[in-house]
Curated annotation (Swiss-Prot):
One of its GO terms (cellular component) is membrane. It is found in: Cytoplasm. The gene is infC. This is Translation initiation factor IF-3. InterPro entries: T_IF-3_C_sf, T_IF-3_N_sf, Translation_initiation_fac3_CS, Translation_initiation_fac_3, Translation_initiation_fac_3_C, Translation_initiation_fac_3_N. The lineage of its organism: Bacteria, Bacillati, Cyanobacteriota, Cyanophyceae, Synechococcales.
Length: 201
C-alpha cells in the first residue's frame, strides 16, 4: 500500500524585504539618508556606506536601470509605512447608520443583546439608530419608551454620545447615538476641573 502523502504544515514563506545583503545587483544608484545623490556605485561600496552610517541599504526601485537604493533606518521606515496604512484604512471607513429595534416592554436578556449589538456598531465607527416600536394602543406609553432609550444612552455612555435625543417619529420613538470622540474619563475630568474653577471664582 503506497504511503499517504504528508500535508505540509509549515507556515507560508513570507516575502523578505530587499535590504542590505539581500540586494544582489552589482551596480546601484544610491540616495543617502539626507537625500543626497551618491550616484551609481557598486553594491559593496553602497553596503559599506550604509554600515558606516549604522543604517540600512533599502531597494526602492527595482525596475530602474540601475536599480535605485536608499540609505535609511529600515525599522523606522517600516513602522511609519504601517502607521500610514492604518490611518488610511481608518479614514476610508465610511460611517453607516445601523439600527437597533426593540419594544418598550423588552425583557432584560433581549435588552442586553441590543446593548451588545449597539456596542459592536459603535466600536466599528458607525452611528446607531435606537428605535422603540409601538403597536396599536402601545403608542400611549411614549414615556416608558423614552425612559428605555434614556437607560440605553446611559448604558452606552462609554462608547457613545447622544447625537439626537429621544423623539417621536410616526409610530416609533427614536434616538441617535454616535461614537464618542472624547474618552468618557477625560470628559468627566474636564467637567470636574470646570466646576472647581467656578467655585474658585
Amino acid at each position: 500500500m503506497p504511503p499517504r502523502p504528508r500535508f505540509d504544515r509549515r507556515a507560508p514563506v513570507r516575502e523578505l524585504p530587499n535590504i542590505n545583503e539581500r540586494i544582489k545587483y552589482p551596480k546601484l544608484r544610491v540616495v543617502d539618508a539626507d537625500g543626497t545623490q551618491l550616484g551609481i556605485i557598486s553594491r559593496e561600496e553602497a553596503l559599506d556606506v550604509a554600515q558606516d552610517r549604522e543604517l540600512d541599504l533599502v531597494l526602492v526601485s527595482e525596475k530602474a536601470d540601475p536599480p535605485v537604493c536608499r540609505i535609511m533606518n529600515y525599522g523606522k521606515f517600516k513602522f511609519e509605512q504601517e502607521k500610514k496604512a492604518k490611518e488610511a484604512k481608518k479614514k476610508s471607513h465610511q460611517t453607516e447608520v445601523k439600527e437597533v429595534k426593540m419594544r418598550y416592554k423588552i425583557d432584560e436578556h433581549d435588552y442586553q443583546v441590543r446593548i451588545g449589538q449597539a456596542t459592536r456598531f459603535l466600536k466599528a465607527g458607525d452611528k446607531v439608530k435606537c428605535t422603540v416600536i409601538f403597536r396599536g394602543r402601545e403608542i400611549q406609553h411614549t414615556n416608558l419608551a423614552e425612559s428605555l432609550l434614556a437607560r440605553m444612552a446611559k448604558d452606552l455612555e462609554e462608547p457613545a454620545e447622544v447625537q439626537q435625543a429621544p423623539k417621536r417619529e410616526g409610530r416609533n420613538m427614536i434616538m441617535f447615538l454616535t461614537p464618542r470622540k472624547t474618552p468618557l474619563i477625560k470628559k468627566e475630568q474636564e467637567l470636574e476641573e470646570a466646576s472647581k474653577a467656578k467655585r474658585t471664582i
